[in-house]
Amino acid sequence: ECQVYTSENNSWLFEFPSLPKGRFNSVCFVYRDSLYVFGGTDNSSNMNEIVRYDLSTQNSGEWTTIAKVNEANQRGGVAFVVEDKVYAGLGEKSNGIRNGFYVSSDSLTKWELIPSIPAQLGVISSGVYDEQKKSFFMIDNDGKIWEYNLTTEQWTSRSLWIRMKNYHMFMLDGSIYILGQDIYQKNKFTVYNPIWDN
């Protein structure tokens, strides 16, 4: 189900049709006035579809499968929109095996695999884009922080944080915040500054 939240009256509106196939643990993003859903699972298999909803046809629109990314069946992962490009992937294929990282632009129907992903990089559960550094900062399922720089196209291994069940990264006023969650231990919350992490 896709809903719209309006802050004016603090309510949710059920204005959109459901996706063509039920799924959860997808990654979502907005690009050029459209909503996109990538991957996810129906609890029996992971998906590689990219589904689009065009907001310019909101009253009569529908979700359309615009692409299937080869070898990208995944649940979880990340999606970033930077200028005119979308970077997505790094979710779980199956049994903890990490998916690739892909880039696309324009119609988002063709996706290119970004090469040279470090073998040690685990399944990514969250990340942020640092505009000043032109880098993605991501955290994998082992609590390891990774940086991917768009200018140099290089991966850098950063700090190892505590191991938790899942992670969420946020960015506010140039600071990166990490929330680690687990059902068997207390949640952890920290500020991460790449300047300290050389």
Q: Where do the protein language model's features map onto the residues?
A:
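Kelch-like beta-propeller repeat domains
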Residues: E1-N198
